[in-house]
C-alpha cells in the first residue's frame, strides 16, 4: 500500500484535468455573485411586478451544502401580499366609475319618460281648452258605442218589421216629445200607411230557407220560421235545441204553429 502523501498526490492529479472546484471555491464564487448583484441597479421581481429593494431581500453570505440555492431577487411573502392588495385597490375605482355611469344613464332615461308623459298631458289639456266641442263629441261617440246591444236580450229581431214611430224621430231631432198622434198625422199624412194583416204575414221570410213560411210557426222568443225548418234545426239533442236567430234554448214542444191558431180564431168568429 502506498504512503499517505502519495495517495493525496494521486487524488489531486485526477481532479486537476477536469477543473472541479473545491467547496471553498464555490462559496467564494457565490459571494462574488451576491456582491455584484448588490452593486448593480435593482431589477423587477418576476412574481408581483414591483421592484425589490436591498433591505427587503436577505441574501446569505454563502451556502453550507451543494443542494442549497441562493434566493436571489425574491421579496418576502408579506411584501408580496401587500403589493397584491394595493393592486386590487387600484382596480376598484375603475369598476365603481363604470357602475356610476350605468346608473346615471338609467336615471336619464326615466327622466325622459316622465317628461314625455307630462308633455302628453299638456297637449290633452290644450286640445280640450281650445276645442271643447270636438272633445265632447268624441266622448259622445265612445259612449254610443258602449250603449249598443251587447247581450242576447238586447238583440234586435230582424225577422219582424220595425214599426214607424214618428214621435221618437221627432224627439231625436230635438222637437217637443209631447206631440200628439193627431198632430203627427196632419204634418206627415203620407208616411202613415195602413197595411192589411194578410199582407204583413206574407212579408215574413223564413231565415232558414229564405222563402215564405209554410205552416207558419213561432218560437217562444218571437221568431218566425217554417214549421218543418224550425223542427229540423232544433233536432233531438239539447246542444242543437236553440233558436237559429238569438240562440236561446227552445224545446220543440214549445214551438207554436200560428196558422193553426189563426184558423181556429176564424172558425170562432
Curated annotation (Swiss-Prot):
Bias (Basic and acidic residues):
1-10
Please name the Pfam families in this protein's record.
Answer: zf-C3HC4_3 (PF13920)
In the UniProt record, which is one GO cellular component term? mating-type region heterochromatin
Q: Which domain of life is it from?
A: Eukaryota
Q: Which SUPFAM superfamilies match?
A: RING/U-box (SSF57850)
Q: Which compartments does it reside in?
A: Nucleus
Recite the UniProt keywords alphabetically.
Metal-binding, Nucleus, Transferase, Ubl conjugation pathway, Zinc, Zinc-finger
Q: Where is the signal peptide?
A: none
What the entry lists under InterPro entries is as follows: SLX8, Znf_RING, Znf_RING/FYVE/PHD, Znf_RING_CS
**Gene3D superfamilies with a match to the protein in the record:** Zinc/RING finger domain, C3HC4 (zinc finger)
The chemistry this enzyme catalyses reads: S-ubiquitinyl-[E2 ubiquitin-conjugating enzyme]-L-cysteine + [acceptor protein]-L-lysine = [E2 ubiquitin-conjugating enzyme]-L-cysteine + N(6)-ubiquitinyl-[acceptor protein]-L-lysine
Q: Does the keyword Nucleus apply?
A: yes
Q: Where are the zinc fingers (RING-type)?
A: 206-247
Tell me its EC number(s), please: 2.3.2.27
Could you mention a single GO BP entry for this protein?
protein ubiquitination
> What GO molecular-function term can you cite, just one?
SUMO binding
Is S-adenosyl-L-methionine a UniProt keyword of this protein?
no
In what pathway does it function? Protein modification; protein ubiquitination
> Per its database record, what is this protein's job?
Mediates ubiquitination and subsequent desumoylation/degradation of sumoylated proteins and proteins containing SUMO-like domains. Acts as a critical suppressor of gross chromosomal rearrangements (GCRs) during normal cell cycle progression. Involved in stabilizing, restarting or resolving transiently stalled replication forks. Prevents accumulation of DNA damage during cell cycle progression.
PANTHER family referenced in this protein's UniProt entry, alphabetically: ELFLESS, ISOFORM B, RING-TYPE E3 UBIQUITIN TRANSFERASE
User: Which named protein is this?
Assistant: E3 ubiquitin-protein ligase complex slx8-rfp subunit slx8
Per the UniProt record, the source organism is Schizosaccharomyces pombe (strain 972 / ATCC 24843) (Fission yeast)
